[in-house]
């Protein structure tokens, strides 16, 4: 009885592992094949990455950070075709017509813009030229230049906006400071201007700005800090400060500006 059972156990023992091996052999081979396939895919994925990095010219240093070469300077920058229309008030049409021969050369020669005066719409039209215009901010500079002239500034003062980048124009009204009407408004404007414009000229010379009095509107052209100093002097005159006190403050302001510059 022992021998047959032993033989059966051996057969079962031999048969059992053979079935498992038979069932597991393909799986083991598939696993091996899968491993090989996965390795091949990884290698194929890494190869394009390396080729992309090599094509892009990325060089890694010792710490693994990329090293980039110096950027190449572009000789010319492309500017999109844009246009701008600046309206001209009726009272500035005659000065614009008389000074037109001096207005368009800086726009055409310096900023490389196309300019024309539209008499029907009473606007100055500016347009960039894709081939000749190189400065992206040329159109804005030209519009600011024309706008300054239409506000009442002299031509030389307006051209300064094209040459200097730190010049601004600030506009405010007398009623923004204090609500005045009738004779009170006229007296406030007279205090700002002074006799024969002496007070206005004193503020301009002390703060290195340019001021235009257009009815109840006040336009100030200059640097940021200079505009603030001129605005403080004008506001104090509107509020009723005597001109003598304002002159004293202007002297201190002028001395500070001399120390700075």
Curated annotation (Swiss-Prot):
GO CC terms? cytoplasm; nucleolus
Q: Report the subcellular localization.
A: Cytoplasm; Nucleus, Nucleolus
Q: Which UniProt keywords apply?
A: Cytoplasm, Nucleus, Ribosome biogenesis, RNA-binding
Q: What is an example of a Pfam family matching this protein?
A: KH_PNO1_2nd
Q: Tell me, what is one Gene Ontology molecular-function annotation carried by this entry?
A: RNA binding
Q: Where is the KH domain?
A: 182-234
The record's listing under InterPro entries reads:
KH-I_PNO1_first (IPR055212), KH_dom (IPR004087), KH_dom_type_1_sf (IPR036612), KH_PNO1_2nd (IPR055211)
Ranges for the region named Disordered are 1-29
Tell me if DNA damage is a UniProt keyword of this record: no
Q: What is its main location?
A: cytoplasm
| Gene3D superfamilies in the cross-refs | K Homology domain, type 1
Q: Is Translocase a UniProt keyword of this protein?
A: no
Superkingdom field? Eukaryota
Q: Which GO terms describe its biological process?
A: ribosome biogenesis
The entry sums up its family as follows: Belongs to the PNO1 family.
Subunit architecture: Component of the small ribosomal subunit, ribosomal RNA processing complex (SSU RRP complex).
Function in brief: Required for small ribosomal subunit (SSU) synthesis. Has a role in the processing of early nucleolar and late cytoplasmic pre-RNA species.
Name this protein carries in UniProt: Pre-rRNA-processing protein PNO1
Species: Candida glabrata (strain ATCC 2001 / BCRC 20586 / JCM 3761 / NBRC 0622 / NRRL Y-65 / CBS 138)
Taxonomic classification: Eukaryota, Fungi, Dikarya, Ascomycota, Saccharomycotina
């Amino acid at each position: 009885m022992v021998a047959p059972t032993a033989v059966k156990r051996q057969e079962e023992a031999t048969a059992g592992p053979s079935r498992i091996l038979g069932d597991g052999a393909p799986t083991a081979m598939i696993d091996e094949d899968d491993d090989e396939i996965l390795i091949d895919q990884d290698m194929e994925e890494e190869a394009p990455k390396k080729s992309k990095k090599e094509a892009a010219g990325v060089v890694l240093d010792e710490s693994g950070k990329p090293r980039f070469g110096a950027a190449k300077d572009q000789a010319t920058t492309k500017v999109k075709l844009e246009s701008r229309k600046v309206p001209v008030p009726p009272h500035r049409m005659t000065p614009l017509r008389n000074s037109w021969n001096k207005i368009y050369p800086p726009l055409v020669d310096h900023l490389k813009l196309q300019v024309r005066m539209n008499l029907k719409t009473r606007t100055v039209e500016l347009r960039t030229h894709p081939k000749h215009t190189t400065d992206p901010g040329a159109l804005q500079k030209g519009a600011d230049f024309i706008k300054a002239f239409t506000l009442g500034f002299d031509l030389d003062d307006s051209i300064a906006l094209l040459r200097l980048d730190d010049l601004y124009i600030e506009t405010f009204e007398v009623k923004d400071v204090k609500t005045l009407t009738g004779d009170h408004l006229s007296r406030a404007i007279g205090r700002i201007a002074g006799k024969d414009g002496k007070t206005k000229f004193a503020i301009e010379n002390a703060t290195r700005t340019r001021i235009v009095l257009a009815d109840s509107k006040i336009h100030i052209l200059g640097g940021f800090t200079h505009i603030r100093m001129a605005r403080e002097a004008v506001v104090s005159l509107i509020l009723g400060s005597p001109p003598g006190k304002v002159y004293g403050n202007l002297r201190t302001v002028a001395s500070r500006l001399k120390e700075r510059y």
